[in-house]
Amino acid sequence: MPKMKTNRGAAKRFKKTGSGRFKCKHNHLRHILTKKSSKRKRKLGPKFMVSAADHKRVVACLPYA
């Protein structure tokens, strides 16, 4: 049986934690930042954990993570 392929787009966006969950970066923090409030930009700063609803799809994209 051939090897399963890793989705390279997902590999660049998600990192697996020690507990087996995945973390990734918020969006909307690259450009056009002047109209966004400091509070909004601060909330978008830290990484966040992928929800349980999306976890199965991320695992399918990253079979060797």
Swiss-Prot record:
Keyword Isomerase in record: no
GO biological process, one term: translation
Organism domain of life: Bacteria
Gene Ontology MF, one: structural constituent of ribosome
Entry-linked InterPro entries: Ribosomal_bL35, Ribosomal_bL35-like, Ribosomal_bL35_CS, Ribosomal_bL35_sf
Key words of the record: Ribonucleoprotein, Ribosomal protein
Position of the signal peptide: none
One GO CC annotation: cytosolic large ribosomal subunit
Keyword Amino-acid biosynthesis attributed: no
NCBIfam families: rpmI_bact (TIGR00001)
Family membership noted in the UniProt record: Belongs to the bacterial ribosomal protein bL35 family.
HAMAP family: Ribosomal_bL35
Protein name: Large ribosomal subunit protein bL35
Taxonomic placement: Bacteria, Pseudomonadati, Pseudomonadota, Gammaproteobacteria, Aeromonadales
